Amino acid sequence: MWIACNLKGVPTFVWLSAKKSSHVAKLVLYNSKGYVFVTDKGPWYRKACRELNCGWIHETFGGRNVVERWFKHIKQRMKGFHKRFPHNAKYETVGLDLPLLFSLDHSTPLTLNLAISKFWK
């Protein structure tokens, strides 16, 4: 899961992918529409930022924690689902829209529209 947040902690872009690569990082950064990105030390970010001609700051703690809070929140909310979906569930049986009933302030529901093609499987 890729999440791009602004400095206020509001997600600007969410993407699900099967792997981490500079191609996927470039897609996420491009759609986030930022000028400078604060990321962890993943090697795919540096290449993607260089190709997009945008700034890149490596940060282990600090402002990047905005995104880490989202991941913690998502993991907590999804803990109960591991018993609901069998390990051999098919893409067709899960569906295209996965509603996640949470937000940063717990007031507005968010929906992740999964745009997964055969390329991403």
UniProtKB/Swiss-Prot annotation:
Sorted UniProt keywords: Plasmid
Under which name does UniProt file this protein? Uncharacterized protein aq_aa24
Q: Can you tell me which family this protein belongs to?
A: To M.jannaschii MJ0017 and MJ1466.
